[in-house]
Amino acid sequence: MKLKGRGIVKGVAEGELVVSRKPLSFLGGVDPNTGIITDPESDIQGEKITGKILAFPRGKGSTVGSYVIYALAKKGTGPKAIIVEEAEAIVAVGAIIAGIPLVTGIDISKLKSGMKVRVDGERGEVEIIAQGDL
C-alpha cells in the first residue's frame, strides 16, 4: 500500500518503522549520542531510532531541536527518514540541514512500529512493504 503526502526533503530510504502517536521534542527528548528517545512523556521512550524510519504527528519544543536532528545525522545515530502528519519548522529545518528524507501529510494512524516501509522524499510517498514485526 502506498500513502501519498508531500515531500519536503528529497531522498529514498527503506527500513523498519518506529511510530509515536505523540508530538516529539528533539531537544531533551532524543539523545544525539545514542539515538535513543529519552522523553519520559513519549510513548516510544527507550526506543532507538538509529537507522530506522521515524514517524510522529509533529515536532514540539525549542527551535534548537533542528540542531539535534542535525547532530543525530552527523553522529550516525539518526533515523534514515522521517514521516510526519505536519512538518512544522523545527522538524523541516532539521531534516533539511541533516539531509534526512522527510515526507509530510501522512496519516500516521495507518502506520505501526515494526512495519517495513520505503520513503520517497521526492515523490512524497510512503510505501508499506511488510506488515508487522520484522
From Swiss-Prot:
For this protein, the parts annotated as crossing the membrane are none
- Claim: Lyase is one of the keywords in the record: yes
CDD domains to which the protein is assigned, alphabetical: AcnX_swivel
Task: Tell me the keywords, alphabetical order.
Answer: Isoprene biosynthesis, Lyase
Give GO terms for biological process: isopentenyl diphosphate biosynthetic process, mevalonate pathway
Please give the Gene Ontology molecular function terms for this protein. Answer: hydro-lyase activity
Q: Which leading EC class covers this enzyme?
A: lyase
Q: Does the keyword Lyase apply?
A: yes
- EC number of the protein: 4.2.1.182
Q: Which reaction does it catalyse?
A: (R)-5-phosphomevalonate = (2E)-3-methyl-5-phosphooxypent-2-enoate + H2O
Q: Where does the UniProt annotation place the signal sequence? A: none
Q: Where is the active site?
A: 62 (proton acceptor)
What pathway does the annotation place this protein in? Answer: Isoprenoid biosynthesis; isopentenyl diphosphate biosynthesis via mevalonate pathway
- Tell me which Gene3D superfamilies the record gives: Phosphohistidine domain
The record's listing under HAMAP family reads: PMDh_S
Q: What does this protein do?
A: Component of a hydro-lyase that catalyzes the dehydration of mevalonate 5-phosphate (MVA5P) to form trans-anhydromevalonate 5-phosphate (tAHMP). Involved in the archaeal mevalonate (MVA) pathway, which provides fundamental precursors for isoprenoid biosynthesis, such as isopentenyl diphosphate (IPP) and dimethylallyl diphosphate (DMAPP).
What protein family is recorded? Belongs to the AcnX type II small subunit family.
Self-association and partners: Heterodimer composed of a large subunit (PMDh-L) and a small subunit (PMDh-S).
* Full protein name: Phosphomevalonate dehydratase small subunit
Q: Which organism is it from?
A: Pyrococcus furiosus (strain ATCC 43587 / DSM 3638 / JCM 8422 / Vc1)
Lineage, broadest ranks: Archaea, Methanobacteriati, Methanobacteriota, Thermococci, Thermococcales
